[in-house]
Amino acid sequence: MKRAVFTIISLISTLLTVAQESQTAYNFLRLPVSAHVAALGGDNISIIEDDATLIFHNPALINDVSDRTINLNYMTYMEGAKTASAAFVKAAGERGTWGVSAQYMDYGTMKEVSWDNTQLGEFSARDIAVAGSYAYALSNRFSGGITARFITSHIASYHSMAVGIDLGLNYYLEESELSISAVAKNLGGQIKAYDDEFERIPLDLQVGFSKRLLNSPLRFSATMSRLNDWSYGIGKHLSVGADLILSPTIYLAAGYNFRRASEMKISDSEGESSHSAGLSLGGGLSLERFKLHIGYAKYHVSANSLIINVSYTL
């Protein structure tokens, strides 16, 4: 039992550093999956694109994804930690779309130590989530969506389970290319804890909009996230982004996440600096059946992250 306690303490310390969170479990669910979303600041829920990865951010948006699209994703994170995901989206009648998705986070191998820092061995940790989604066009302008997700986490010989639901709503005015969305992510909780103490899953209430300037290649987006948590200033809820749409097939994107920049500030001899954390960049190529998106950002002061999305319509 003593060995198990120190195992858990060691892991929790590591994972809190990785996730930049201290109040919830399964914080890998907060990481962006879409490279396009990552490039726009990491929290976008309102872009209207034929992009299957949007299933992970707002289920209401998959109505615009091509029928029978398969999607594979990979993200580099901190050293030793990697994450991968996949999705499949299919039309269901004239107004409906369904999809399935999965996420996998591998934290690598970590040291198991005692209270006096004696190494007792090594252990691994990983998180897995599988989900089913459904979106329906409520009218020509409104779409709604729901995702039901099963989550499991393994730490050495210990594991936990949880269930969560995402609810999404989108309003899209095609003639002015204005999109407004609201999402409630991770409504639910643990059904099996590591030990006897149950933890919360990362509930996140978000609202956002995207607007393309008429007769212009520029589209701007703004998203307010974690509106259920007001423990920090209103500005830190905001992420902003802009797309430069060079053609119907090519775009470049950039964004800024104010919360991430604030959380990752560190002090040195020259003062405080976030070392470019908060800034994100990306781009994509969208052909008739093949799509490639790449996004770059920093989610930890010690490492850069690269997200690659590949989608193919069967």
Residue ranges and their predicted role:
Residues 2-10:
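Sec-dependent signal peptide recognition
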Residues 10-11, 66:
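Short, linear, compositionally biased motifs with a strong N-terminal bias
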Residues 20-314:
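Subset of outer-membrane beta-barrel
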